[in-house]
């Protein structure tokens, strides 16, 4: 029978072997999933575009298409400020889309049902649904909009 000192030594040796094996496995995993790092910073003041309400919604809006020029990005991340009286016209959704209200008030019609949206409201519109949005009151309705798109094929280099 081994005494307590030998049992402790064996446990430590086994723990060291397990730790080294796990480290080697993690290193191999890191090698497989290595991706180049980096980041992109954009400020809304640099990308603001005055536009009419999208989807023939009327009125004036300010659109901010963050990271629009970043290649191979499938996430669309936008901010839109709807000026008083403006809106986003009724349209059918081609992909899941999320709206999040930062400030102001709006009236959103979702598949024929109208609901009020206020700061802190998040709305998920699913593929095939229809919706429109109208700014309400004296304050701009400021929203964030997120959805994914498929990557566009790139032309082969000549």
Residues covered by each model-derived region:
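Glycine- and acidic-residue-biased ligand/ion/polar-headgroup-sensing regions
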Residues: 94-97, 101-106
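Bacterial N-terminal signal peptides
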Residues: 13-24
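A short, N-terminal "cap"/entry segment at the start of jelly-roll beta-barrel domains
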Residues: 10, 26-74, 154-158
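Bacterial N-terminal signal peptides that target proteins for export
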Residues: 2-15
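Short acidic-glycine-tyrosine-enriched beta hairpin
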Residues: 113-128
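Short beta-strand segments in beta-sandwich/barrel cores
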Residues: 87-88, 104-109
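Ligand-binding loop in jelly-roll beta-barrel domains
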Residues: 127-152
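Conserved short histidine dyad/triad with adjacent acidic residue
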Residues: 76-93
């Amino acid at each position: 029978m081994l005494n307590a000192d030998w049992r402790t030594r064996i446990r430590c040796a086994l723990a060291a072997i397990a730790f080294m094996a796990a480290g080697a496995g993690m290193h191999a995993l890191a090698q497989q999933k290595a991706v180049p790092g980096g980041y992109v910073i954009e400020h809304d003041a640099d990308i603001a575009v005055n536009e009419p309400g999208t989807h023939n919604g009327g009125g004036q809006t300010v659109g901010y298409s963050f990271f629009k020029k970043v290649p191979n990005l499938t996430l669309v991340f936008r901010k839109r400020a709807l000026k008083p009286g403006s809106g986003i016209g009724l349209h059918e959704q081609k992909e899941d889309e999320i709206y999040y209200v930062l400030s102001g008030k709006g009236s959103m019609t979702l598949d024929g049902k109208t609901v009020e949206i206020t700061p802190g409201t998040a709305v998920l519109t699913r593929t095939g649904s229809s919706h429109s949005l109208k700014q309400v009151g004296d304050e701009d309705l400021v929203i964030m909009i997120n959805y994914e798109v498929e990557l566009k094929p790139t032309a082969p280099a000549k």
